[in-house]
């Protein structure tokens, strides 16, 4: 039976919306994706509303953080919110007033999109970030009244800094995440691996004459980039490596540069979530030796992972060890390619999603 599947998301952040649309359609279903803002990495859009006040933009994000320091202290917006799950609410009169104004501004654009694309007619609606168009959650309420299936997919700040939206959390048929640390933040959260077309890349079979190390942060604070840059720059000054800091470029350019590396470093620390994300999924798919910090809980969750574990105290030593063992770099990359195909390939991840669909009563 053909299903109509809708995704609603602030942005097509790492390209997964495009991937899911393609996969659902390959299974004979209809799929549309609606984003509030255009992708900062130029991923393909389906329905993009181009709404004002995009707080993922650096300038507005910085302004928001300064504002939240008034209520949350020195850490501002990045302060971890308490609760299981933490629940969103406006923080003070000014926040409440601004959000009412923003919703007033957004509502006619949203309502037009609902009518133009018949968004109430879908069988299942995925809310990436677990968030309705507006803070009054009018769209979710109408979906519930029409007995549509509602799925929330939480990422990073959604639970760490913001919290669940009060109404959607009570009516969601399924809550999903790709991030292991978030499982501790919500009692009804299920895990699913981040999907990727792992077959898009041929794994490398030889290394550069001088080992090339890459790091590609979207947020230096979250990735522990200052330390990574410092260590790699020191090794580069010793002429042991070539260091490529990939940032503020298109996704296509980032992939091209990443593919030329021999070692990829994802993150140090747990400030922006545990372990790894799409950056590592891409590098593993390229057959690149990938370094990141994997804490004990994550190590238990994925015990046979291919990552080289590093911390702020071991990064320099680990890099020097790898530089002197080129065969280890190649072997690690080959093992990573096999692992990522099993766990992250879109075909395998979609099978898991369709199992979840069946569990909530959708006829797949």
Q: How would you describe each model-predicted region?
A:
Residues 327-358:
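A charged, aromatic-enriched C-terminal amphipathic alpha-helix characteristic of glycosyltransferases
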Residues 124-130, 140-159, 174-177:
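Active-site proximal beta-strand in glycosyltransferases
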Residues 4-9, 98-104, 114-135:
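Short N-terminal targeting/anchoring amphipathic segment
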Residues 151, 158-159, 169-203:
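Donor nucleotide-sugar binding/catalytic pocket of nucleotide-sugar-dependent glycosyltransferases
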Residues 267-278, 292-306:
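Nucleotide-sugar-dependent
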Residues 283-292:
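Short hydrophobic beta-strand element within catalytic cores of glycosyltransferases
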Residues 6, 203-223, 229:
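Conserved donor-binding/catalytic core segment of Leloir-type glycosyltransferases
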